[in-house]
C-alpha cells in the first residue's frame, strides 16, 4: 500500500530576529508532526505568513505577503505581531483561514491541523535535537525573553507582545548548549529588552550542571561565555548593571559588542520618547567602557524627525555622535504607528525635513565609521566566514553582527569553509567594511 504524501507548508517569515525565532519554533513543531516545507506557495497545501506590525510600512509589507500567498495558494494562515490586531487583515483578506498574534504557537498548529491534518509516522525522527533553524548553520538567534516593561511613546511592542516574560536560566542554557553541539559558532542573544532579563522572575535560580544560575543578565552572559561559542548581546538597554558585562568582554568571555538602542541624544526628545534622558552620563559610561575594554564595538539605532525634534535637538544628536563614536549605526525616519502615543504629540515633522536630517545623520556616521575602521588597518582580527567565493571570502569580525553590520572581505591561500573562524591581517578599510588576508587558522 502506497503511503500518502506528507502535507506541505510554505512559510513566510517577516520582521525582526525575535519573529524569526517564533518562525523556527513553529516550523520545528510542524516538522516533528511530519509536515514538509515547500519552496513555492503554489506547490503547498497551505501557507503560513508570520507578520510584522511594528511600523505602518511593515504592515504594508505583511499585507502584500498575505496577498501574494492568497493569490498563489488561497489557503493562508496568518500569525505574528500584525495578527494581534486582526481587523486590517480581515478587511483586506476575509478568506484567510486563521489570524493569531505573536507567540501563539498552539493556535497556529491547531489552524494547520484543521486545514490539513498531519500524517506523522511516529517511527520517524524528523527533527534534530536543536530544532529547525532558518539561519545559516554557524550562527543562531537565542531568544531569552518575550515582551517589554518599557512604555516608549513611539512603540506598540508591549501592546503586541505583552510585558516582560523571561525564560529560566537553565532553559536558555540547555538550548544554547544544544545549538553549540550542533555546530553553531555564534550565539546572538536577543529579546525586546535583554538587560532586563529575569526581572519578572525576581532573578530566580535554577539548577545547571553542578551549580545554580540566577536568571540575571550578567549571570546568564557569564554562563553562555563558557560554552565555547561567540556570544553577541543585542537590544541592551543602558541600565546601570550593564557596566558589569564589560568585564566579561575584556576577559574574552563574550564578544566586545553591545547593541544599545539609544534612539536619540537630546534630553528633550528622549523625554518625549519616554526614554532615559541622562545622555551626559551615558557619554561618561561609554568612555569608561572603552577604557576597560578597548576593543568594544557599539551598535545603536536612532530615530530622526521625531515629533517636536528641533534643529537644535538634531544638532545635539550629531555632536553627541561625534563624541560617542558609535561604531555601527542604524537610523530611521520617524513613522507614525497606529496605537502609539507619539501620534498625538504636537509639532509633527515634515517628510522633507525627516529625509534631510536622515541624510545628514548618515553622512556624519559614515565619517565616524570610516575613522573607527581605519584604526584597524594593520591589526589582526578573528573573522567568522559567512560566504565563500572563487577568489574572495566574506566574513565578519567580532564587531559585526550578521545582516545589520559591515563585512570583512578576505583573500586566502587555501579554500575557506563557511562557519570557519580564521585570523586575518587587515590591509585596508573603507566607510563600512574591511579588507584583508588570512594569516592563520
UniProtKB/Swiss-Prot annotation:
GO terms for biological process: tRNA modification. Its EC number is 2.8.4.4. [4Fe-4S] cluster 2 binds at residues 148, 152, 155. HAMAP family: MTTase_RimO. This is Ribosomal protein uS12 methylthiotransferase RimO. Catalyzes the methylthiolation of an aspartic acid residue of ribosomal protein uS12. InterPro entries: Elp3/MiaA/NifB-like_rSAM, Methylthiotransferase, Methylthiotransferase_CS, Methylthiotransferase_N, Methylthiotransferase_N_sf, NA-bd_OB-fold, Ribosomal_uS12_MeSTrfase_RimO, rSAM. Its cofactor is [4Fe-4S] cluster. Its main location: cytoplasm. It is an enzyme of class 2 (transferase). [4Fe-4S] cluster 1 binds at residues 16, 52, 81. Keywords: 4Fe-4S, Cytoplasm, Iron, Iron-sulfur, Metal-binding, S-adenosyl-L-methionine, Transferase. Residues 7-117 form the MTTase N-terminal domain. Residues 374-440 form the TRAM domain.
Amino acid at each position: 500500500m502506497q503511503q500518502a504524501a506528507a502535507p506541505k507548508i510554505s512559510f513566510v517569515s517577516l520582521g525582526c530576529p525575535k519573529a524569526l525565532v517564533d518562525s523556527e519554533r513553529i516550523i520545528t513543531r510542524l516538522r516533528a508532526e511530519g509536515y514538509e516545507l515547500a519552496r513555492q506557495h503554489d506547490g503547498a497545501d497551505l501557507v503560513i505568513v508570520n507578520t510584522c506590525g511594528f511600523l505602518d510600512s511593515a504592515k504594508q509589507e505583511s499585507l502584500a505577503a498575505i496577498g501574494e500567498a492568497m493569490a498563489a495558494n488561497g489557503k493562508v494562515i496568518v500569525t505574528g505581531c500584525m495578527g494581534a490586531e486582526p481587523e486590517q487583515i480581515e478587511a483586506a483578506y476575509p478568506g484567510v483561514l486563521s489570524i493569531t498574534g505573536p507567540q501563539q504557537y498552539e493556535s497556529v498548529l491547531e489552524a494547520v491541523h484543521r486545514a490539513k491534518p498531519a500524517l506523522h509516522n511516529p517511527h520517524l525522527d524528523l527533527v534534530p535535537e536543536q530544532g529547525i533553524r532558518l539561519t545559516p548553520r554557524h550562527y543562531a538567534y537565542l531568544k531569552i525573553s518575550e515582551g517589554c516593561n518599557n512604555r516608549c511613546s513611539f512603540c506598540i511592542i508591549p501592546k503586541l507582545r505583552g510585558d516582560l516574560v523571561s525564560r529560566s536560566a537553565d532553559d536558555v542554557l540547555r538550548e544554547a548548549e544544544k545549538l553549540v553541539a550542533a555546530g553553531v559558532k555564534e550565539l546572538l542573544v536577543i529579546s525586546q529588552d535583554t538587560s532586563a532579563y529575569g526581572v519578572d522572575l525576581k532573578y530566580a535560580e535554577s539548577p545547571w550542571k553542578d551549580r545554580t544560575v540566577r536568571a540575571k543578565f550578567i549571570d546568564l552572559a557569564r554562563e553562555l561565555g563558557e560554552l565555547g561559542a561567540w556570544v553577541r548581546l543585542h537590544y541592551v538597554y543602558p541600565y546601570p548593571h550593564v557596566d558589569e558585562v564589560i568585564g566579561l568582554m575584556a576577559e574574552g568571555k563574550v564578544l566586545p559588542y553591545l547593541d544599545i538602542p539609544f534612539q536619540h541624544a537630546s534630553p528633550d526628545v528622549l523625554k518625549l520618547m519616554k526614554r532615559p534622558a541622562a545622555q551626559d552620563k551615558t557619554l561618561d559610561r561609554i568612555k569608561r567602557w572603552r577604557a576597560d575594554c578597548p576593543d568594544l564595538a557599539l551598535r545603536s539605532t536612532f530615530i530622526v524627525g521625531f515629533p517636536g525634534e528641533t534643529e537644535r535637538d538634531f544638532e545635539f544628536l550629531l555632536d553627541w555622535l561625534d563624541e560617542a563614536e558609535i561604531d555601527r549605526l542604524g537610523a530611521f525616519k520617524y513613522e507614525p504607528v497606529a496605537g502609539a502615543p507619539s501620534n498625538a504629540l504636537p509639532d509633527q515633522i515634515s517628510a522633507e525635513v525627516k529625509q534631510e536630517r536622515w541624510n545628514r545623520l548618515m553622512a556624519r556616521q559614515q565619517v565616524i565609521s570610516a575613522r573607527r575602521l581605519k584604526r584597524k588597518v594593520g591589526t589582526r582580527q578573528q573573522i567568522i566566514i559567512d560566504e565563500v567565493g572563487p577568489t574572495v571570502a566574506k566574513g565578519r569580525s567580532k564587531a559585526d553582527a550578521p545582516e545589520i553590520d559591515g563585512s570583512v572581505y578576505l583573500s586566502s591561500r587555501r579554500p575557506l569553509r563557511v562557519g570557519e573562524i580564521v585570523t586575518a591581517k587587515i590591509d585596508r578599510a573603507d566607510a563600512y567594511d574591511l579588507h584583508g588576508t588570512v594569516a592563520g587558522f
